Amino acid sequence: MKKKALLPLFLGIMVFLAGCDYSKPEKRSGFFYNTFVDPMKNVLDWLGNNLLNDNYGLAIIILVLVIRIILLPFMLSNYKNSHMMRQKMKVAKPEVEKIQEKVKRARTQEEKMAANQELMQVYKKYDMNPIKSMLGCLPMLIQLPIIMGLYFVLKDQLVDGLFKYPHFLWFDLGRPDIWITIIAGVLYFIQAYVSSKTMPDEQRQMGYMMMVISPIMIIWISLSSASALGLYWSVSAAFLVVQTHFANIYYEKVAKKEVQPFIEAYEREHNGGSNKKGKNTQVVSKKKKK
């Protein structure tokens, strides 16, 4: 449910990003502008003008990387919680499915409440916290205002240096560029693909939709915006690809190690402490190998 809710949230954000406009001075006011947009403008201007000898392309890259590094602890916590929940659910799934069947067959409110209490006991047994799982998108919500602040600085070209010193690599930061737009779209496709690899099968369809929708939206906005925005998206997506890939490798190992005692307890419970492998044990063992 949580993952499905991210799709309309993402689409809503993209519509908001495409529609807001701070290019006119009279519109540069309000809580969001003063709290997130204006500080980003000042930092980018300081980096490009004072620290990097008017190299605003490099200033954008450094600022994006600094923001991503600051937000890294939130994202790593999200990766860890996601992998822990996924590995524990593999072990608990047979018991959870049985109780869910009881809930479906329940005819009275008392029977449903009893089944739900039983389900909570299973969650407690495997140290699973559904509320913690529901808060998994919190890191994304925390970072959005910060990332969006920089987005509006670049989209509406609020830094004068982008006009005075626009040249970076092969493109003009103040004008659209097809190649940096394509690079941004491809990188966001890869980022969505890397993220979808760790999704459960029932959620993977949503991941595939994001693989199509996010690059299209990125390309659509970038084609009519300054290439500084495409550079920002390219650097951000490249960082996320590397971050997601290595975080998934590391936290999958951590989660499997921490879940191992639950697997052993499950096997003892369903095999009576013997070496004989039953059907349920084989299911858990197969899931463990994946």
UniProtKB/Swiss-Prot annotation:
<dbReference type="GO" id="GO:0032977">
    <property type="term" value="F:membrane insertase activity"/>
</dbReference>
<feature type="transmembrane region" description="Helical">
    <location>
        <begin position="134"/>
        <end position="154"/>
    </location>
</feature>
<keyword id="KW-1003">Cell membrane</keyword>
<keyword id="KW-0449">Lipoprotein</keyword>
<keyword id="KW-0812">Transmembrane</keyword>
<keyword id="KW-0564">Palmitate</keyword>
<feature type="region of interest" description="Disordered">
    <location>
        <begin position="270"/>
        <end position="290"/>
    </location>
</feature>
<keyword id="KW-0472">Membrane</keyword>
<dbReference type="GO" id="GO:0015031">
    <property type="term" value="P:protein transport"/>
</dbReference>
<dbReference type="InterPro" id="IPR047196">
    <property type="entry name" value="YidC_ALB_C"/>
</dbReference>
<dbReference type="GO" id="GO:0005886">
    <property type="term" value="C:plasma membrane"/>
</dbReference>
<dbReference type="InterPro" id="IPR028055">
    <property type="entry name" value="YidC/Oxa/ALB_C"/>
</dbReference>
<feature type="transmembrane region" description="Helical">
    <location>
        <begin position="207"/>
        <end position="224"/>
    </location>
</feature>
<dbReference type="GO" id="GO:0051205">
    <property type="term" value="P:protein insertion into membrane"/>
</dbReference>
<feature type="transmembrane region" description="Helical">
    <location>
        <begin position="176"/>
        <end position="196"/>
    </location>
</feature>
<keyword id="KW-0143">Chaperone</keyword>
<dbReference type="Pfam" id="PF02096">
    <property type="entry name" value="60KD_IMP"/>
</dbReference>
<comment type="function">
    <text>Required for the insertion and/or proper folding and/or complex formation of integral membrane proteins into the membrane. Involved in integration of membrane proteins that insert both dependently and independently of the Sec translocase complex, as well as at least some lipoproteins.</text>
</comment>
<keyword id="KW-1133">Transmembrane helix</keyword>
<feature type="transmembrane region" description="Helical">
    <location>
        <begin position="56"/>
        <end position="76"/>
    </location>
</feature>
<keyword id="KW-0653">Protein transport</keyword>
<feature type="signal peptide">
    <location>
        <begin position="1"/>
        <end position="19"/>
    </location>
</feature>
<feature type="lipid moiety-binding region" description="S-diacylglycerol cysteine">
    <location>
        <position position="20"/>
    </location>
</feature>
<feature type="transmembrane region" description="Helical">
    <location>
        <begin position="229"/>
        <end position="251"/>
    </location>
</feature>
<dbReference type="InterPro" id="IPR023060">
    <property type="entry name" value="YidC/YidC1/YidC2_Firmicutes"/>
</dbReference>
<keyword id="KW-0732">Signal</keyword>
<dbReference type="InterPro" id="IPR001708">
    <property type="entry name" value="YidC/ALB3/OXA1/COX18"/>
</dbReference>
<comment type="similarity">
    <text>Belongs to the OXA1/ALB3/YidC family. Type 2 subfamily.</text>
</comment>
<keyword id="KW-0813">Transport</keyword>
<protein>
    <recommendedName>
        <fullName>Membrane protein insertase YidC</fullName>
    </recommendedName>
</protein>
<feature type="lipid moiety-binding region" description="N-palmitoyl cysteine">
    <location>
        <position position="20"/>
    </location>
</feature>
